[in-house]
C-alpha cells in the first residue's frame, strides 16, 4: 500500500485488521514524515524507540486477531498530557527536564486501547495563546499557505502542534485540550476536525492545568469519523478527577450517517458580529443550506449575554491560572534559579521560567482576585457566566444544536498579532462561550477563503449529547466535501 500516512485513522484501523499493513510499517512511515517536517516545529519530543516498541507489541496482538479499538494506530500527544518517563513540559521553560512518574488518565485510556505514541506535540505555553507563538520551543508553522505567498502562518492555539501535525500527516490523530477554543480554532485554521467534549466527559487527571473549570481534553482528527473514534477511547469516568462525570460512553461512530431529518438547528443572532469578513458570513449561510437540504429545520435563537463572554473568560481563566501556576516554584521539579534565600529563589525561578503571556495572565488573575477587586471583577464574572449558561439552556429548549462560524478569520501570519493581545483574544469570540457553559462543540472544515486557506463551521450541542453533535457534523462534512490539502512545501 503506497503512502501509508494518507490513510485516515478509520482507514488505517481497517487495513491493520485485514493485515494489509502492519503497525510497524505505519509507525515507521510516520516517523519518516516527522523527520522531513522539522520546519513545521509540530513536535517538541519524538519518542521513536518507544513508538516502534509499541507498534511491535500491537503487531503481535493483531497477528492473533486480538487488540483494542486503536490497536497499532500512531498518535501525537499534546505536551500538556503527562506521559510516564517521557518529557512533559507544557512547552514552558519552568518545566525543563520534567519526566512524570505517572500517566494521564486520557493517555492511559489510549494505550489501553492499543494506540502508539509518536511523540509530544508543541502548544502555547501552559495552553495560554491562540496562535502557538508563546511556546518556549518556538512557534508552530501552519502547513497551509496563502495563494502566491510563502509567509508563515499560525496553526491556531493553543493546540497548534496537534492541528499542524494532523493537517501535515505527521500522525493519524492527536490529543488536544480546549479552555477557550484551543481545539476548535486550530482545527478551523488547518482544515482538520476538532472536538471539544462536554466538561467532565474526559478526565483532566494528569493534564497540566490552565483553568480547571474550563479545561477539557478532546481530539483533533482528519475527519468526523476519526474524532468520533478517538473520543470513544479518550472519554470515561475517572475517580481521580472529581469533575469527571460517571456516564456511559456511547458508540460515537455508530451514529455517523444517521438521518438528521427533523433536527432543529439554532442560529444565534448575536454571533453576527461587526467587521466579520463576508466570506465567513457566506460560509455560515452555506452551512445553513446544507443542513436544510439534509432535512433539518433552522431557526434564529438569542444568546443575549454572549457579548460579555470574552471579558468574562479573561477574568475567570486568568484567576484560575494564577492559582494553578502558584505550584511552579523551583523546589521539587523543573527549572530552579538560585537566589539569596528561598523567596529570592521563587521570584527568580518564576521570572525566568514563565514567558511573557503566562506572566501577563498570572498578573491579571492575581489582580482580579485581590482584595477590593474580587467583588468588582471575579464575582461579577462568575454571575455573568451563569447567565451565559442560562442563555444556552434556554436556546436548547427550542433547538437540538447551534451552528456558528468557528473563528472570525482564516489563519493569520506569525507575528501579525503578537503586539496586540486584545486582537489575539478576539480570535476566541465564537468559541469561548461554549467553555463558559461547559457544552460540547466541534469544528468542521467547510470551505476555503479567497486566499486559499481553510475555514471552519462550529456546531454546539447539549451537555453530554456528543452523539447528536457528531451526527450533524457528519452531515456538514458530507455536504461540504472538503478535500483540499496543503502542498508539502516543507519537504522542498
From Swiss-Prot:
Record SUPFAM superfamilies: Amidase signature (AS) enzymes
Keywords assigned by UniProt, alphabetized: ATP-binding, Ligase, Nucleotide-binding, Protein biosynthesis
One GO cellular component, as annotated: glutamyl-tRNA(Gln) amidotransferase complex
Pfam families in the record: Amidase
InterPro entries recorded: Amidase (IPR000120), Amidase_CS (IPR020556), Amidase_dom (IPR023631), AS_sf (IPR036928), GatA (IPR004412)
Catalytic activity line of the entry: L-glutamyl-tRNA(Gln) + L-glutamine + ATP + H2O = L-glutaminyl-tRNA(Gln) + L-glutamate + ADP + phosphate + H(+)
Entry superkingdom: Bacteria
E.C. designation(s): 6.3.5.7
Catalytic-site annotation from UniProt: 78 (charge relay system), 158 (charge relay system), 182 (acyl-ester intermediate)
A molecular-function term among this protein's GO annotations: glutaminyl-tRNA synthase (glutamine-hydrolyzing) activity
GO biological process entries: translation
Function: Allows the formation of correctly charged Gln-tRNA(Gln) through the transamidation of misacylated Glu-tRNA(Gln) in organisms which lack glutaminyl-tRNA synthetase. The reaction takes place in the presence of glutamine and ATP through an activated gamma-phospho-Glu-tRNA(Gln).
Subunit structure: Heterotrimer of A, B and C subunits.
Family according to the record: Belongs to the amidase family. GatA subfamily.
Annotated protein name in UniProt: Glutamyl-tRNA(Gln) amidotransferase subunit A
The species this protein was found in: Parvibaculum lavamentivorans (strain DS-1 / DSM 13023 / NCIMB 13966)
Gene: gatA
